[in-house]
Amino acid sequence: MEEQFILRVPPSVSERIDRLLSEDASTSDEIPLDLFFSEDGRNGTFMIGNDEFPASLLDLPAVVESFKTYDDCALVKTADIGQMIMVREPGDPAPNTVEYRHGLTPPMKDARKRRFRREPDLNPELVQRVERDLLNILSGGTVENVSFSFYFRHMMCLYLLLGFSNFIYLNFFWCRYMSKRNQLRTRMLVMQVRKYLLLHLHLLKSLKLLRQALVIQQELNRREVNQKILMIQCEFIII
């Protein structure tokens, strides 16, 4: 495999390069064509003849495969291209980031925004809390400062989402291209999942009543009650 890159130059420079490639080798050797980079490896200078142009090394949003042929019939892959050297006019501004927004073809215009999945907006404090609780569970401890009402509300939202996804699942797979055997398997699977969700929802309602009964007793504080409730829920999930 070779190491290759895309060289994008202004129209005036591309015309000069085309003339150099079309001329004889002896004439083209007299005109220097070189590229220099600074210490950071991202900014450099493109030289053609006595003229210098600023250049930047950018990362493409997708990998482009490069092929070559000797007989105009068989293609041989030579490299995976993921970077581009953009040569610009001396007065043009430099790019703000090293990640180029667009691809090489018109369908890949603004690919990083239109085709890439956005990073989830997570609260750093929530992430640290989940990591800390996970380490406590793995070490044999319990989750701290858990509100049962908070857990109950989020579990209800989760069930609603699962119910909607099951509806989409049925409408997507129960089509004429699906065999009767697969339809039967799908119905059995959905019935088992629905039965499990209803049983889990009934258990949560029972645990809510159990928590209210345990809080009334004076010998148990709120933290001990939450720990007992979570232990019962974990045992049910494992079963």
UniProtKB/Swiss-Prot annotation:
GO CC annotation, single: transcription factor TFIID complex
Keywords, comma-separated and alphabetical: Activator, Nucleus, Transcription, Transcription regulation
InterPro entries (alphabetical): TAF7, TAFII55_prot_cons_reg
One BP annotation, GO: transcription initiation at RNA polymerase II promoter
Pfam families linked: TAFII55_N
Tissue occurrence: Expressed in roots, leaves and inflorescences.
The UniProt record lists the keyword Transmembrane helix: no
Stated family: Belongs to the TAF7 family.
Role, per record: TAFs are components of the transcription factor IID (TFIID) complex that is essential for mediating regulation of RNA polymerase transcription.
Subunit and partners: Component of the TFIID complex. TFIID is composed of TATA binding protein (TBP) and a number of TBP-associated factors (TAFs) whose MWs range from 14-217 kDa. Interacts with TAF1.
Name of the featured protein: Transcription initiation factor TFIID subunit 7
Annotated source species: Arabidopsis thaliana (Mouse-ear cress)
